[in-house]
């Protein structure tokens, strides 16, 4: 398999159509002999109004890439932009506001507050920020996700799939510029997982949203417009209009050629049990998308 050029791999887009981008993005953990290079000079554009999946084995850098693009983690070198805003030079308070106002998050854990009903969980980030939701948009999101008859239910009264639908509605409710989803179907059975993936697809097609999803599942990646394959902290390939079979075959080819090594442990940093929060990697600043400053 030939190695595509860096420009081909990242499909650098026109600025007006870019939701997020990175140039020379490098992230290292530790120092000296214990240094782990999680991302190695990555150049990538995330096209606006598209569904992008990021795939790779454990330790390939996929979650670290999402964290850096979302401002949940600092970078060791390089630059990151959300739209026209360079976020690599922002202070933590500015990053917190940017995440709260312009980014939606979905994690493997649903992160719903058990004492709030579905509607209250959906509007929680805006309530914390002291903002009123766009009523027409909120009602459209609720209907699109089929939650109209579940709005007064608390999380314990909802199935796993319904809880993740609430989490999806929460991510969409503020009409963000970009939604980051980290293994959003990881805690769901296959039927519920397909429902959530269908809703993310519909958010792009019907609501003109932009979604970036980290996944290890070829079936999940097949719902996207574009798959970026990471290996050893680099983007090693890409696939337009993916199918589950084609993605699985591509991953097998990487494994056989050693193009996607999995020697490193999983990327540092996992989602917390608090709504919309993220545990920062060692020596990284705290990252809470919902914190009010």
What are the residue ranges of the model-derived segments?
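ABC family nucleotide-binding domain
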Residues: 17-226, 230
